[in-house]
Structure formats: C-alpha cells, structure tokens
Amino acid sequence: MVNDTLTINTKHLLYALYASGVKHFVVSPGSRTTPIALMLAEYERQNSEIVVYIDVDERSAGFFALGIAKTRQEPVVVLGTSGTAITEYMPAVAEAKVSHIPLIVLSTDRPAELQNNGAPQTLPQHRLFGELTPYFVSFTLQDEHEDNTAYIDYMTQKLVHSAMDTGQPLQINLPLRKPLMPKLHDSHDVSITPLTFEKTHIHILPIVIKQTHVVILAGPNEAADYKDELLQFSRDHQVPVIADILSRARTTDTIFGVDSLIKAHYLTDEYRPDLVIRFGGTPVSARVLQWLQRENIPVWHVDGHAGNDHSRHVTRAFQMTPTAFLTQLALTNDMTFYQRWQQLNDIPRHAVGEASVSCMLNRILPENTAVFVANSMAIRDMDDVFSGRTTQKIYANRGVNGIDGVVSTALGMSTVSSQRSILLTGDLTLFHDMNGLMMAKKYQLNIDIIVINNNGGSIFSFLPQSQADEYFEDMFGTPLDLDMSKVAYLYDMPYIQLKGAAALGECLSHQVHGPRLIEINFDRQENVANHRELLELNQHE
C-alpha cells in the first residue's frame, strides 16, 4: 500500500532542500526512514548533483556528514530513524554547533499516537538536541491539507538559509505513521519557488589605528578563505601575522610555532605589540592567549561570531568578516618591528618524538593536500612545527575539541578532495571511532590514515596527574594494546608499520587506491623526555 500524499510532500521536502543548496546526504537506514530514503535514492538517479552515502553507524554518519559540510562549506543532511538512533548524532551536532557548521538532521519519528505510552523505539524527539540546534521544525508529511505542501517548501528553505547564514545546525523532525511506502517513479511534477535571501553589507567608516607595533593573530577559520587578502595586507602595511595551523592562512610568510617561542622565552619586550588584531576562533595554542593576558596587550576580535572569547581579554569586537575589516583598516606599522617578527621563522625548529611526524609531513606533502588532524597531541605538534612550506588544507574538530568522530569526519573530508587525503591521529582517537573505517572500505576512499601509536593517551603525560605514579596508567595512560595490523585486516586495507617518521616520505610516494593504514610507534615517556630536552635546547640557542 502506498501513500500519495506522503510521496508528494517527501518530494517537496527533498526538492526544497536542494533549492536551498543541499546536495549531499548521509543516510543511516531504519524502518521509519523508508519514505525519505527511497525517494532520496530515486532523486539521486534523476539529479546528477545529488550524492547519497549510506552509513549504518549513526554516530559515524553524523561526523561523516560534518566532514563533508566542513570541507565544502555548505549544508549537509544526515537522515536517521526514530529512537536512540537519533541520539547518536548528538556528538556531531555539538561539534557543528560550536564550529558553526550548518549540519541538518532529518529525524524520522513515530506519530503522535505512539508517543508517551510505551510504544517501542519511541522517545520525545521534539527539539531533541535542545540548544545545540537553534533551528527546528516538525513536518507532517502525511497531512493532506493544501497549505501543508507550501509550508514545507517555505519553511525548509527559510530554515536552511538561516542555518547557513549563522553557521548553526538544524533539526527537521518527521513524525510518520504506517503505511510508510511511497509511490516510486511518481510522475507528479514538483515546482519549488526559490526563496532568495540577500545579505546586506554594512559599510562603516575607515578604521584608523595609530599604534605602530600591531600584530595580526589569525585563528581557526571555518569560513571563506581570506589568505590572499591577509597576506597582501601584511606585506603592504608591514604587519606580522601569527597564523594558527587551522587558519587556512599559514605560509612561509606568516609566523608559526609561537607556542614554543613563548615557552622558550623568545618573545622579549622588543616583540611586544601595542595591539593584536585577532581573526577567527580560539587558537590551538592556549599559551598564546595566556601571553596576551600576562603582557596586558589590547586585543581586537574580528569574526562573524566576535565576542566569543573565553579568555575575556578582548577589548573590542567587530562582528564582520576579516576581508571586510581589512578593506576598511588604515595603519602604518614600524618596519623594524615587522622585520624582527619575520626573523622568528629563522629560528631552528627541532622536532623530536611524535612531533617528527608533523615535521616530516611539512617537508613531503604535495600542494593542496587535505589533512585532518586529531585533537590532543597531534594538533598541538602540527601547530608547533608545520611551517606551511606549501599550501595545505588543514582541518580538525576544534569546536568542542573531542576525540570522538575524528576518523569519520576525516573520511567525510576525503570525499571532497581530488587527490589522496591524510588523517593524522593517535591510537586512542582511532579506537574511539573505529566503526567509521567501514566507510573507507565501502567507498574505497583515497586516504592515508597515519596512526601515532603510543599505546594510550599521550597528552596526560604532560599534565600534573602524571605525577600520580600509582594510579596514572590505569586512570589516564589507558594502554589499549591494539594490534593495528588486525584493525587494517578487519577493514581490508593495506597496512604498513614504520620504525620512524623518516620513512614516511618513501611510504607515501607509493600510491595505492583506497584507504591505507600506516602505523608509527612511540613511547609516551620517551616523548615527554624528548620535549623537555628540546625546551632546554631552545632556551640555550
């Protein structure tokens, strides 16, 4: 038995999503998703721009969709069935919320008569994600009222555009009652009236800065690339740029590794700026913000979400894009001050232990390689030693900074790149999202998964709890004793174990099709000792 009303309204929902810029869908199959999933599969055959991925693990699916949205900078839909399945999207929705990514959750639901009376696979899904999804709507696709279809067309476009404009996730809840089968190969013509939203650009008076010792701090950036405009401004006005590894602006013309420079006491009074103009999100290096506070350096924050400053040290916030800000900024910086900062990049960077992997990647990666970096030590090491010798696309989940979902997000990212991608991760992070590797196998994604295997959580060895010798290994070190060769075997991917980072270049030069797992082993205690020796070496240079 088929439902004509359900068929028509489902088509309108999918067409309205497409009219709003949605082209990529990640589906976690379940009984209640039946009408949406089937109509979507049919729509994919009819429209070459529609791409559908199937991920049977909802937690992985949420992050896979996030990876596509993060890389493409466009909304992506994840579709799931009712009950606890939908709750598995929560971690990805949380990351999308804080990272300002327009992730759209289509949550199929049980109808009203099955709510709150013990029906199986049923829970309250109305605004299930709470404040994490500022935008929410519930559509009754089986309602025959003539205004309902127009409502679906309008509200879908309105809310998707709102989610895109603000960089926020959206939940569309779909209560469905049986029969769930749509009418396939339906000839009903769907016509969507496009809803156009025009952004207004506010022009303000030129921003004149009288200070002559100004530094720009380019933080993590999930929005449009402004690297060319930033570097041109830096050259024209002699303003040094500290570029975070996730700023999309790091090159050999920008300052890198500031965390280690501060730690080694390189930034003496002659480097002290009168003003720091900060773009983007919170820098990977916490030490940079601590330095600004300690030195009481005035900070202006420029971002579409300016004012989100946990350091509470920002003195002036501009809610605008960096590009718009730079076009209105007038200043004359001190040339000697600029040159002094630029010379910081001449200081030798000694990469030891686990950081040697990031250093080697900096030397060997081809232009425009997409690299996803796990949190904890991997992203910190990358921020410290990756100079931006060539233009790379570096990504990470630095919204909530969790280690879950990293594999799936990286795999979503890899679907966008035309060349092989890289995931740099630790063994603990890989374990957290091992299910995600099924997508690499299923779609034969071209990605090299480089696992820094220190048998546990390396970052805790740098923290005070490492002194609690009696309890540390069980409570924080958490050795997993995973055999990575068996992980690779489980997902039918080539496996290579390297003795050190030096062999990475030759390894990556051997091209393969599909995913590949590369393991490099390190000892956690030796890694800590190496970092301490390196700090002493830097302090004496």
Swiss-Prot record:
Xref: InterPro entries: MenaQ_synth_MenD (IPR004433), MenD_middle (IPR032264), THDP-binding (IPR029061), Thiamin_PyroP_enz_TPP-bd_dom (IPR012001), TPP_enzyme_TPP-bd (IPR011766)
Subunit record text: Homodimer.
Enzyme Commission number(s): 2.2.1.9
Protein name, as recorded: 2-succinyl-5-enolpyruvyl-6-hydroxy-3-cyclohexene-1-carboxylate synthase
Gene3D superfamilies: 3.40.50.970, TPP-binding domain
CDD domains: TPP_PYR_MenD, TPP_SHCHC_synthase
Catalytic activity of the protein: isochorismate + 2-oxoglutarate + H(+) = 5-enolpyruvoyl-6-hydroxy-2-succinyl-cyclohex-3-ene-1-carboxylate + CO2
Listed GO biological process terms: menaquinone biosynthetic process
UniProt keyword Manganese, yes or no: yes
Function (record text): Catalyzes the thiamine diphosphate-dependent decarboxylation of 2-oxoglutarate and the subsequent addition of the resulting succinic semialdehyde-thiamine pyrophosphate anion to isochorismate to yield 2-succinyl-5-enolpyruvyl-6-hydroxy-3-cyclohexene-1-carboxylate (SEPHCHC).
Keywords in alphabetical order: Magnesium, Manganese, Menaquinone biosynthesis, Metal-binding, Thiamine pyrophosphate, Transferase
Cofactor descriptive note: Binds 1 thiamine pyrophosphate per subunit.
Pathway where this protein functions: Quinol/quinone metabolism; 1,4-dihydroxy-2-naphthoate biosynthesis; 1,4-dihydroxy-2-naphthoate from chorismate: step 2/7; Quinol/quinone metabolism; menaquinone biosynthesis
Cofactor: Mg(2+); Mn(2+); thiamine diphosphate
